[in-house]
Amino acid sequence: MDDLYAINAAKSEFREGFNLADPSRMLAIADPDLVNFSDGQPSEFGESGLDALKTRLANLFERFTAKLSVIVIEIRLQGDIAYDYGWHDLTLTPKGGGEAIRRRNRYVDIWRRNQEGNWKLWMYMDNQDIADPFRPEQIPSAGAQVHGSF
C-alpha cells in the first residue's frame, strides 16, 4: 500500500471511530508509545496515556453526539517517519439537549512506521484555531489608539 494512502486511510479510520463514538477504533491507529499533547488536557505518554485517553473519550461520547471533519493540508514523508497537519472541525451536541458546541483545532500528527510496515500515530498535538488579528479590515487607522497586546 502506498504510504500516503495508508496515512490517509488511518486518518479516515480515526474520523470514523470518532463519529461512531468508538474509542477503541480511534486508538487502533495509535503507536503504543503515543505522545499526546491535546489542547487543554494533561500530557499523556505510552500505554497509561492511551488508557487515560480512551477513558476520556468514552466519557465524552456518553454525554455528546460527536461529528468530526478532518481537513488534511499536507502529509510529508521522511523515511519511516511522516507528519501531517491541518484542522479538525468538531461539533459536540449534548445528548441531554442544549446548544451544540463547535470548535476548530489545528493539529500536527507525527507517524512512525512499525516493524510490520504499518503507519501508527506516534505523536499528536493540537490547539484551538483563532482568527488572524492582522486582517486588513481589523487594522486600526494610524491615528487610532490600540489596546491590548500582540
What are the roles of these predicted feature ranges?
Residues 87-88, 125:
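A mature extracytoplasmic/lumenal domain signature
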Residues 2-8, 12, 20-78, 87, ...:
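A solvent-exposed, acidic/Ser-Thr-rich amphipathic alpha-helical stretch
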Residues 104-135:
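Short beta-strand edge/turn micro-motifs at domain boundaries
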Residues 90-94, 111:
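Beta-strand elements of well-folded, non-transmembrane domains
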Residues 120, 131-150:
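Terminal "cap-and-tail" regions of soluble proteins that handle hydrophobic small molecules
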